[in-house]
A protein has these predicted regions:
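Hydrophobic membrane-insertion alpha-helices, especially the h-region
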Residues: 10-21
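Beta-strand signatures of extracellular beta-sandwich domains
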Residues: 78-82
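Asparagine-centered strand-capping/turn motif at beta-strand->loop junctions
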Residues: 69-71
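N-terminal edge beta-strand
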Residues: 35-64
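N-terminal Sec-pathway targeting helices
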Residues: 1-10
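Extracellular/periplasmic metallocenter environments
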Residues: 21-22, 26-30, 102-148
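Extended, low-complexity, turn-rich repeat/linker tracts enriched in Gly/Pro/Ser/Thr and Asp/Glu
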Residues: 73-76
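Short aromatic-acidic-glycine turn motif
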Residues: 85-95
Length: 148
């Protein structure tokens, strides 16, 4: 292969790699602009200074989301996804920690937690941290579920 061909191939590979990285970053940060699913999708949520990096997520009905929660804070947090009844139970402080229940996870400082939630019905679903004062501080967001 000639030197010019090797240079051209290197440029094409570099551009393709950059575009692939951009596409991956876009999927990770889709948030409010792109409806994900249906099927299984993974969404990463970082916690820093008692704030979720994700404020809003759009999915299609029939989507199961695997939430990966990276707790970068020096304190414990939780990530609870669910309807008003689920949120009300947790706001009353009924659970000090969360066993493996779909849509619920407690994450220790510096740790990564995982939970799955299947979105069937069109509407809005809240996610929040209900540890004392965290919800009022702004640790919450919404998942908007739309028809496919």
């Amino acid at each position: 292969m000639s030197r010019a061909a090797r240079v051209a191939l290197s440029v094409v590979v570099a551009i393709a790699t950059a575009l692939a990285g951009y596409a991956l970053a876009d999927a990770r940060n889709a948030g409010a602009t792109t409806a994900l699913g249906p099927g299984l999708v993974t969404v990463t949520v970082d916690v820093h200074y008692s704030k979720f990096s994700l404020e809003e997520l759009h999915v299609h009905a029939g989507t199961t989301v695997r939430f990966l929660i990276h707790n970068n804070d020096p304190i414990r947090h939780e990530f609870i996804v669910g309807d008003a009844q689920v949120q009300a139970l947790h706001e009353k402080g009924t659970h000090p920690a969360h066993p493996p229940v779909p849509g619920e996870v407690t994450v220790a400082p510096g740790d990564v937690g995982e939970t799955f939630y299947h979105f069937d019905e069109v509407g809005r679903v809240l996610f929040a941290c209900h540890l004392p004062g965290h919800l009022a501080y702004g640790m919450h967001g919404w998942v908007t579920v739309s028809r496919r």
